[in-house]
């Protein structure tokens, strides 16, 4: 949601001169995962029922607005307006319903696996950025390892490992944001 991006920027700015500065893409992923873990996130299924959507927004948005205004001292706009968010995301929910785009992901994938259909999971980033196994605190908010495919899709871990798992490894580490970069060269070697 729009307030996730705003909060991401606010928090990164607040941490910019500290050891807590992890550097982000600014897309609001961290605050979104905070809401998921806090069980206050708005999920795709919530968009399909206007009453549920409004209830979720009325619960979460005032907390986010208070954080931005009272903790960080900022003025907030439509990104923190329950009515504006409700209208925008209710329309998204209507479109999702009309076009049949929402499915139970675990069930959808299990049907394909049981039907011998090939299933391909694609991830990004890597172990060094994994929230549990990466170079903390310079990590993303998710699990971008092969095990994360099971966590994020609803299929069992045996499904991911039962077929073939192909890992792609770069010859060097790269990253978005700040944090250690073990393969980084300094001095004259860095100028090649």
Residue ranges, per PLM feature:
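Non-transmembrane, aqueous-exposed alpha-helical and coiled segments at domain scale
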Residues: 1-192
